[in-house]
Amino acid sequence: MAVKDQLRVDREFKKTPTGRLFFDSMTARITDLSNVRILACSVDTVRQLYRGLIRPEIMSLFDKPGTIVDFAGQRWHSGRVSKDSGYQYKLQNADLGIILLVKNFNAKLENIGPHLKIEVSPHAIDQFCPERLQERLDYYADHVLTNVERNQCAVHLALDLQGWQPPADLVARMHCRARAARDISGIKEIQWTLESATYGKGQSYLFGSAGGVQLGIYNKTEQARAIDKLDYWENVWRRRDSFDEADPDNYDTEQDVWRVELRYHHSVIQQFASGSFDLHSGETIETNSYAAFAPHLDGLWRYGLRQFKLLARPGYFEPIWTLIRDDVRVDLPVDSLVDETEYKRQYKTSRGFSGKNVELFLGNFVSLLARERVGARKAFYRLKDWECWPVIRDHYA
């Protein structure tokens, strides 16, 4: 059964697509969202991946990890990174807000492979339009690799708002296909895009898996304060303020900001690039870069809020979910193609290569585990760390 929206009305109880009053026809309950302030909806993270052959001179930058090196006309901090990242080395420039992850763990140095991922922080994304940012990323890629080609991107979309906070029963009322749901109360340690944050009160919720689509809901004020970035974010949140200091739609320094964040893995972006098509020409969009995909981010925002459904009662969306799905647009200086594109994900079928080979692999894998007396828990965690885990998971989904 398709989930429906409650009736949107104005103060005179006339139906309107922009009303902030929501009427539940079964319970006769009216929800007033007039005091909800949409502060910003932005791209919080970009990860651009590249394939190519690592230039010979690049590896010398990592001879002494932890030192400052010259690269592409700028000063960078070189170092090693954990195997969990999938890469061996990094070049980081905190002033630019850019990290280059170099040398894929699962590809040989002398071979062409997925050897580069560039991670971009919010303040760097904010400084450049998508085209200019893409030019900068491609510039760095050309200095790291030869035979370079773009290998898709990953994006995080973040909505910051005031006048709303998650209900206590959020987890129970959030419906989604994802198996993973976490309620992080405390708050404990959370891994953010470019840093680790530990802070001590509030709540944070995370739904979905890192290898697919994730929904995060958390207190952005607390998180920004914990990493000493509150001044930066308050400047961002004030951008929509009017000249009237008493305007109720202005950012309120006395009220916490909550963030609703959708995180799209690069494999999911690839599914959209292969399965989505232009309504006029019928051609698939076939993008492989952040700049090319930027006009489609409104479509991803709407898609995510239909995949993760916050319900008021069975069959009906919570009013806040309708509001942020229909009224919010991603703040980017590009023309949105959301009304000109049909968004679909093209999944690999389980017939043929991936299906047959997954089943054969798992059969042999289990036999080897039994022979070597490896416990089920240890084996499962090792399997989840493997790059082919998303293929196995999707096959049995």
Each model region followed by its residue ranges:
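Structured, helix-rich domain cores that form ligand/interaction pockets
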Residues: 1-343, 356-397
